[in-house]
């Protein structure tokens, strides 16, 4: 049992037994399929539970981590201290006029589907991003010349004082893979995107096209966290890595993808250390060859 068992009992006062676990392996919750256990993992089913959990964590000085769909996360082999709050059960999506509103845990593919079903265009870029809308707002996720900054209208967040506030597009300060949510440690609980009216057939065609492009170019057959590195200004990370002769480079069960050099993948049986060692070698080699620093797009968290 871990050091947070007394805190676990406090949380148990407002969680059902199936919504709170101890020493939950993070490899079961993230796309990379690596990582040690979370001391406590909770899956809230309403906003009140989220607020109560955050208040307790802050009152007792217990660290916490917000988890969406786990698609852009690398958890170290030592696991995560404190509490992981997983939003997968907060996934309601509603549509009103040209706006789609989704709870933080709603998957981007499902928001994209809701937009399609209501003949709304502009969210097609997100159809293949394997994340939640909360995570997408957090990092201003994007693909294929689209990003959340292009469509976001507003978001409801929990601030550092556990107060719920509404932030406009401008107040969210969305930049390249960044936001005020990321900078200030806010927690997204709901987001609204504003789209344009379109024709079902043309929207569906674009979704199908982007899906085919993604499947043909990305190593979806292996666990990964998507694009491992941010795009350096004036360059493409994948090309720098490929031109450094690193395609297929591996350590343990982790490797640079043969299909797309911008992806570090879990070929099978990788540890988080394997992945981190591959990332470090890629960064060092690209720096030596091109004097360009590659920064990770994947979030690296946890204990060594």
From Swiss-Prot:
The active site is at 177, 227 (proton donor), 297. It is found in: Cytoplasm. Residues 33-198 form the FAD-binding PCMH-type domain. Pathway: Cell wall biogenesis; peptidoglycan biosynthesis. Its EC number is 1.3.1.98. It catalyses: UDP-N-acetyl-alpha-D-muramate + NADP(+) = UDP-N-acetyl-3-O-(1-carboxyvinyl)-alpha-D-glucosamine + NADPH + H(+). GO terms for biological process: cell division; cell wall organization; peptidoglycan biosynthetic process; regulation of cell shape. This is UDP-N-acetylenolpyruvoylglucosamine reductase.
């Amino acid at each position: 049992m871990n050091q947070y068992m007394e805190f676990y009992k406090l949380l148990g006062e407002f969680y059902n037994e199936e919504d709170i676990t101890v020493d939950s392996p993070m490899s079961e919750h993230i796309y990379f399929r690596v990582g040690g256990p979370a001391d406590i993992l909770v899956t809230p089913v309403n906003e009140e539970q989220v607020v109560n959990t955050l208040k307790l964590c802050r009152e007792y000085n217990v660290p916490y981590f917000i988890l969406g769909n786990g698609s852009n996360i690398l958890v170290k082999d030592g696991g995560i201290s404190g509490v992981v709050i997983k939003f997968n059960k907060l996934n309601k999506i509603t549509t009103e006029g040209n706006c789609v509103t989704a709870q933080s845990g709603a998957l981007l593919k499902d928001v994209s589907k809701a937009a399609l079903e209501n003949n709304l265009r502009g969210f097609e870029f997100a159809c293949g991003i394997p994340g939640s809308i909360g995570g997408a707002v957090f990092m201003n996720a994007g693909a294929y010349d689209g990003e959340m900054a292009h469509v976001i209208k507003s978001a409801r967040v929990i601030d550092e004082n556990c107060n719920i506030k509404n932030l406009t597009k401008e107040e969210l300060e969305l930049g390249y893979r960044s936001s005020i949510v990321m900078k200030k440690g806010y927690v997204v609980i709901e987001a609204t995107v504003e789209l344009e009216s379109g024709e079902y057939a043309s929207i569906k065609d674009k979704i199908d096209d982007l899906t085919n492009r993604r499947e043909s170019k990305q190593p979806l057959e292996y666990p990964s966290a998507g694009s491992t590195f941010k795009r350096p200004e004036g360059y493409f990370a994948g090309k720098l890595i490929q031109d450094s002769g690193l395609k297929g480079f591996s350590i343990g069960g982790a490797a640079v993808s043969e299909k797309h050099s911008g992806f570090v993948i879990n070929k099978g049986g990788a540890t988080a250390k394997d992945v981190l060692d591959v990332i470090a070698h890629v960064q060092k080699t690209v720096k030596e060859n091109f004097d360009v620093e590659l920064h990770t797009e994947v979030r690296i968290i946890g204990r060594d």
